Amino acid sequence: MSDRLCLLTVHAHPDDEASKGAGTIARYHAEGVHTVLVTATGGEEGEILNPALDTDEVRANIAAIRRRELDDAAAVIGYDEVVLLGYRDSGMADSPANADPRCFARAPLAEAVGRLVAEIRRARPQVVVTYPDEQRGYRHPDHLRVHEISVAAFEAAGDPAAYPFAGVAHQPQKLYFTVWSIEQIVARHEKFVELGITSPYAEWFADGWPNRMGGLAPTARIDVSEYYEARRGGLLAHATQIDPSSPFWFGLPEDVDRQLYSAEAYVCARNLVGPIGAEDDLFAGIRENVAAPGG
């Protein structure tokens, strides 16, 4: 019997942990679950999206600044640990950064999987959260590679013969993909229209985006209605990446935004404790085999 619940998430860049699943982490952290953030890269290729910080000094020190932002955001959200796998940001597809031998997308797959296996075996989570391979809206090389290494590491971590240098074998019980619910995005777009505010999603809908995004229907919806501030604060901690006046993140009145941000959606990709079905708890089927949350 394990002596604590542990949730490990795998993200590509600093700020991804704030935009994907922050409310879920805040909720489980508040319940006493041990929460671990693994970030693959330092986000060195990220554009400075906050005009107030777009200076020569910030650009020259972007790697160090983004690491500080990551630590600040993780503290606001409720991560107990932050681990960097140590790769360089690969940049967008077909950008010059793709050619850098230090970048994540160019790392040998077995090497990157081994690094993640080591973290899984060290932290010993029951639940791992990562990205799906179906990323039609944002096919960043690092996001696709995160999916690859996460699935492979989930399978390998419990095999003593795989990566024997990476610690004592440990098999997580469930693997989830974090997804943006199309229904929630539609609801947000419609609320912008209803309130007479220009919708940042208008172009998406104009070119048929919802019809191209089908395929992954959420199997789990986690109630995060009490953790709106954690997500908002986590986003704002990434000051170089998040413009506080951004209509995408903050275009709706806060009370309206809070109502629309009531749940976060996931797809269960592996479940070793039972059949995959509708859930409202990522630890469903696991809790009874753990001595005590946070124990």
Region locations from a protein language model:
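Metal-dependent de-N-acetylase/amidase catalytic core
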Residues: 1-10, 97-98, 102-295
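Active-site rim/loop-helix segments in enzyme catalytic domains that contact anionic ligands
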Residues: 1-124, 255, 267-268, 275-276, ...
